[in-house]
Amino acid sequence: KLGEFSPTRTYRGHNKKDKKMQKK
């Protein structure tokens, strides 16, 4: 459930993966 609050500053590298998961 990281996409719920998508903390970009918490993990920038995961931010790109999180965006792809949110699109799905």
Swiss-Prot record:
The keyword Lipid biosynthesis does not apply. Residues 11-24 have a biased composition (Basic residues). InterPro entries: Ribosomal_uS19_SF. One of its GO terms (molecular function) is rRNA binding. One of its GO terms (cellular component) is ribosome. Transmembrane segments: none annotated. One of its GO terms (biological process) is translation. Gene3D superfamilies: 30s Ribosomal Protein S19, Chain A. It comes from the Bacteria. Residues 1-24 are annotated as: Disordered. Keywords: Ribonucleoprotein, Ribosomal protein, RNA-binding, rRNA-binding. Signal peptide: none annotated. Belongs to the universal ribosomal protein uS19 family. Protein S19 forms a complex with S13 that binds strongly to the 16S ribosomal RNA. This is Small ribosomal subunit protein uS19.
